[in-house]
């Protein structure tokens, strides 16, 4: 399952902004970077008119697995999990979240990875 369009984080400027300004939360198999999108410099043209206040992206490196099938399976797993967890969330401001999986994540089963993801989202204050 793919993240709904209104929940996707797109554009290299968004990712650059998250890397420079975002807060980092670490676990043994992933890193969560979170930032408040209202702090970003306004880009001329389009204003953000999203009905959803949380946008996400997931990065899975070739170091995690050389097989694209495995990486895509992990990506789909996380997209499905995030769309279920964050679909009914409402925040006052727009939040951008970026999850990077570490190469050590392949040692863990899927359920453990999803629990770690939930812990990081709670630690970041996105979910309760």
Curated annotation (Swiss-Prot):
SUPFAM superfamilies hit by this protein: Ribosomal protein S5 domain 2-like
Top-rank taxon, per record: Bacteria
UniProt record, GO biological process: tRNA 5'-leader removal
Gene3D superfamilies listed in its UniProt record: 3.30.230.10
Signal peptide span: none
GO terms under cellular component: ribonuclease P complex
GO molecular function: 3'-tRNA processing endoribonuclease activity; ribonuclease P activity; tRNA binding
UniProt-listed Enzyme Commission number(s): 3.1.26.5
InterPro entries to which the protein is assigned, alphabetical: Ribosomal_Su5_D2-typ_SF, Ribsml_uS5_D2-typ_fold_subgr, RNase_P
Enzymatic reactions: Endonucleolytic cleavage of RNA, removing 5'-extranucleotides from tRNA precursor
Keywords: Endonuclease, Hydrolase, Nuclease, RNA-binding, tRNA processing
Subunit: Consists of a catalytic RNA component (M1 or rnpB) and a protein subunit.
Family: Belongs to the RnpA family.
Role: RNaseP catalyzes the removal of the 5'-leader sequence from pre-tRNA to produce the mature 5'-terminus. It can also cleave other RNA substrates such as 4.5S RNA. The protein component plays an auxiliary but essential role in vivo by binding to the 5'-leader sequence and broadening the substrate specificity of the ribozyme.
Record-given protein name: Ribonuclease P protein component
Gene: rnpA
């Amino acid at each position: 399952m793919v993240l709904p369009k209104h929940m996707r984080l797109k554009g290299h400027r968004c990712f650059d902004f998250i890397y420079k300004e975002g807060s980092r939360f670490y676990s043994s198999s992933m890193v969560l970077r979170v930032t408040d999108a209202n702090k970003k410099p306004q880009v001329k043209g389009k204003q953000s008119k999203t009905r959803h206040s949380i946008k996400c992206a997931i990065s899975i490196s070739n170091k995690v697995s050389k097989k694209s099938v495995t990486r895509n399976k992990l990506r789909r797993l996380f997209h499905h999990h995030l769309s279920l967890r964050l679909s009914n969330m409402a925040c006052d401001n727009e939040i951008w979240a970026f999850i990077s999986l570490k190469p050590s994540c392949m040692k863990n089963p899927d359920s453990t990875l999803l629990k770690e993801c939930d812990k990081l989202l709670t630690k970041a204050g996105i979910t309760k």
